[in-house]
């Protein structure tokens, strides 16, 4: 239960960071996808189910506040969290390369699927323009922010694991 509550608080914090804070630091109208960082981080650190749940909550938040249809972003973030969780077994906390790579790939696929769902299906075939003005800048910006945000998430996760383990040993 603690894991869920802490993850929920981190999702809300990342949502506020992405929508309120980084809005003032947008480069060319692009802000980093902090929600993808927390979704992929949750999956990597806790596994598929936790990543799936974090992705669902994150996606529903985006759907409610910014989506035209409820559920599209939820599905995209759920897939990102689930597939990030597949790498949980080979996750080493001191190695930032794997999580950063998963966040970059997850954000790229997320943006590409958004292009397909929202533009390509409406016969807007400007993939080059969308790639250079939306996808690549957001992925780069997200990667830069992930270098700073991921260690904070990792530290919170490690501290939470220590607290849970200490409280579990009290009852044994």
Q: What are the roles of these predicted feature ranges?
A:
Residues 1-172:
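Terminal, non-globular segments
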């Amino acid at each position: 239960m603690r894991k869920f509550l802490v993850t929920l608080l981190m999702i809300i914090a990342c949502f506020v960071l992405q929508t309120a804070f980084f809005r003032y630091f947008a480069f060319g109208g692009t802000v980093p996808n902090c929600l993808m960082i927390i979704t992929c981080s949750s999956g990597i650190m806790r596994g598929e189910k936790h990543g799936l749940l974090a992705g669902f909550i994150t996606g529903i938040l985006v759907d409610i506040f910014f989506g035209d249809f409820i559920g599209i972003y939820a599905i995209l973030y759920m897939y990102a969290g689930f597939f990030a969780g597949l790498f949980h077994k080979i996750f080493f906390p001191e190695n930032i390369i794997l999580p950063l790579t998963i966040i970059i790939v997850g954000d790229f696929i997320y943006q590409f699927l958004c292009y397909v769902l929202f533009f390509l299906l409406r016969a807007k075939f400007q993939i080059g323009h969308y790639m250079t003005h939306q996808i690549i800048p957001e992925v780069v910006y997200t990667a830069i922010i992930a270098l700073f945000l991921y260690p904070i998430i990792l530290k919170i996760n490690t501290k939470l694991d220590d607290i849970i383990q200490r409280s579990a040993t009290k009852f044994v």
